[in-house]
Amino acid sequence: MDAAIRGNDVIFVLKTIGVPSACRQNEDPRFVEAFKCDELERYIDNNPECTLFESLRDEEAYSIVRIFMDVDLDACLDEIDYLTAIQDFIIEVSNCVARFAFTECGAIHENVIKSMRSNFSLTKSTNRDKTSFHIIFLDTYTTMDTLIAMKRTLLELSRSSENPLTRSIDTAVYRRKTTLRVVGTRKNPNCDTIHVMQPPHDNIEDYLFTYVDMNNNSYYFSLQRRLEDLVPDKLWEPGFISFEDAIKRVSKIFINSIINFNDLDENNFTTVPLVIDYVTPCALCKKRSHKHPHQLSLENGAIRIYKTGNPHSCKVKIVPLDGNKLFNIAQRILDTNSVLLTERGDHIVWINNSWKFNSEEPLITKLILSIRHQLPKEYSSELLCPRKRKTVEANIRDMLVDSVETDTYPDKLPFKNGVLDLVDGMFYSGDDAKKYTCTVSTGFKFDDTKFVEDSPEMEELMNIINDIQPLTDENKKNRELYEKTLSSCLCGATKGCLTFFFGETATGKSTTKRLLKSAIGDLFVETGQTILTDVLDKGPNPFIANMHLKRSVFCSELPDFACSGSKKIRSDNIKKLTEPCVIGRPCFSNKINNRNHATIIIDTNYKPVFDRIDNALMRRIAVVRFRTHFSQPSGREAAENNDAYDKVKLLDEGLDGKIQNNRYRFAFLYLLVKWYKKYHIPIMKLYPTPEEIPDFAFYLKIGTLLVSSSVKHIPLMTDLSKKGYILYDNVVTLPLTTFQQKISKYFNSRLFGHDIESFINRHKKFANVSDEYLQYIFIEDISSP
């Protein structure tokens, strides 16, 4: 070390507290002076009431100092307690400084401890009401930058220690242009208490921290990195709330005004002491005022308000700055596209390889916890606090403004662990499946080891299906519609018609239903007859609400329409149930629009009866007949003589149990996918079979007999008038009585009388009170010569 560095015997002192910076820099003799040690001692002897404060003359040019500490305890310890406390104090602070010197300065731990414990001086305050002293470690040298960097370490030591002296260390002295009262001098002219020397040290240089006289016993260390490198250029991080908002919070805490409030900025707020105008007692501890100012520090994402001097003489207040940090966490989670807002206002969450609604359980909270380890370290620790997690969750909900359209992949079948492509048979999982935002799924995991064609379950299943719908020439059309209907339940798109499963009891309708439910899980829902017989959009309708996004709806056990009082199927309902959107809300909810993707299957033992029949209705009805009866041995003979059955098979008593245990789940799913590829690629095809409905017979036939009259028929009026037609208002019409006579040639009035009367009542018009007519022409009347 350079000789100039090893020694300094010129002591620079301030003559009062609060010397202006300009006077200090210009070394105005009214405020500052420099002394040799003997000169300083004579000056104090000659001026016993003087106030002198030791300081570095020019920190940039020379900043080597002895390690020193200022301890100020607002209590008087007796001699025994003091000796015990001072001994522990020396051990604690030497260990603390040695650890810091080893970590940040590369010093030898043992050498630092040895130099500090072997040689130090202690002053003693003449104030009998408190325990106050300055301690100078005479052979342990460092730089002012090092002491400033050590400030936080010593502050943490003072907080954690149980030693009253250690807890009373004033860390505020470790700052730029710091000062320490010279031994034997007053704090101000009106204060008669001073610090005095104690044996064995009776030379003034032993009590000066800027006096440097290195020898063989001395030990010097300094920061390996500059203080500027340890402290960030900008204290205020982007993740914090705005600095202005934070300082306003600080101001509200004090209640009393902060005189130098406008002097605080992002770069200096930790170094500028707060000057408080104590109009009222301190808001933190209720004391009338404080001798030392409060100061701010920045730790762990929060502003810490503490008092300089003895920091324990006032409460410490923490102001969290994590508002924007929690907002940034929410933004980062949103950037993963793992939380979306649906068009119905629901939140869906991508968790465990599938999209799920956030309604039944707090899935957003679970997502936040599961995604925590993917976030930067400074963010992940914040999410361990339940309060902050709730804040992040609220931020996520508030930030989700734009809704997304979901469930727009009709050829994708969602599972708990991924998505099955019905077209190419590929199964997507993880991020590959994430892009298919399907909010409902089967509710079970796809297992490709069971999704195979060659298996004992498949062999058993095929026998069951072939018993229910035999592969015969007579049943070929029926079997094809059966396969089309069931495989269409995989498709997530609106179906053009409803299918009736019509047959007597014990013909396999319920078995088919249970197989389908096992294969598609939660995409299947069973509902009641009310969706067919009651007004749909009148009040809450949980039956319709439960259909939202389901792919199969089974309506079981229609009433016997021959019974008096039974409601007929409303044709308006049939039309509405084939629309993409069905109106119906759950109880206590305003969600009325339900997306209709379901294949609606009506399981009935009785032929359906409709309140009104027209072409629109007939285009929306398909019928699959079930004519194989499954009987117990005791009833087999009677069943074989029943014309309603084509075949009679023995009932397998254990079949229901196997289906409920999902034995045939993946076998039937494989079969459905196979049928889907056969019938519904490239487009889904499901055609009506109105000819299978007895009530439709009249309307199907009459459509081949009549056409509506128009102006193009007027030139034919010469021939038509001979057949009973008349011209009324330039329209060819047929009088009601003539129409009844002509129609009776095609329909038996005893069988179709009600249908004929309904048709007439719907289409007849009045020429006057007594004359009625229809604007129809029989096709044979205009096609025959």
From Swiss-Prot:
Its EC number is 3.6.4.-. It is an enzyme of class 3 (hydrolase). Keywords: ATP-binding, Helicase, Host cytoplasm, Hydrolase, Nucleotide-binding. Disulfide bonds: none annotated. Its main location: host cell. GO terms for cellular component: host cell cytoplasm. GO terms for molecular function: ATP binding; helicase activity; hydrolase activity. It comes from the Viruses. It is found in: Host cytoplasm. Multifunctional protein required for genome uncoating and replication. Major viral uncoating protein that is required for the release of the viral genome from incoming viral cores containing the viral DNA genome. Possesses an ATPase activity that is required for hexamerization and uncoating. Belongs to the orthopoxvirus OPG117 family. Homomultimer; hexamer. Interacts with OPG148. This is Uncoating factor OPG117. It comes from Monkeypox virus.
